[in-house]
Amino acid sequence: MKQTHNLAAVDLGASSGRVILARLDGEHLRLEEVHRFPNGPVRVADHMHWDVLRLFDEIKTGLCKAGQAAPLSSLGLDTWGVDFALLDRDDQLIGNPFHYRDPHTNGVFEKAFALVSRDEIFERTGIQFMQINSLFQLFVMRESAAVERARSFLMVPDLFNFWLTGRKANEYCNATTTQFYNPRIDGYDRELLAKLGLPNDIYPQIV
């Protein structure tokens, strides 16, 4: 008798999310959407945020549906890049993450490049310059109470993975969207972070 592996895939996009049940018997892969839900920014006080608590509730609902349909042996979760969450010393969420379309990073390049040149940042990180990149989001927040309290920095998908597993880590592909991952050293560029006045001790292992 063929052994069937049942896997759950959580796919979050900017406008919707879904949970897929995948059944693999060694010859065939069957996919079934077991849960779909809307996603989008929440506007609060002229800013746009992700409602990560509701999204996590939807993820759990979808995983329960998948688990009721078949015993799960593994799960995977993905979202967009650049956005992140900050946790305090007790691993409590410090506010809902900013949405990448929020205007709080408008004009950030001029301020950041006054401290570290565009050429140096590119030489260290090698990715496209966008004001939504995590480096610039964190830069505009650098004097905020949220950053002062922060003890952990997790990309959005890794926040959900932490809540599901209890393990803190930032997945490699998402870490490269921060613009403070340095491929030359295969890790966070702590010297770049220091030059920009950003914390350099709140980032978990890259996996």
Describe each PLM feature range.
Residues R89-L93, K111, L115-V116, E120:
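Hydrophobic or amphipathic alpha-helical targeting/insertion segments
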Residues F98:
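Surface "functional belts" at beta-alpha junctions
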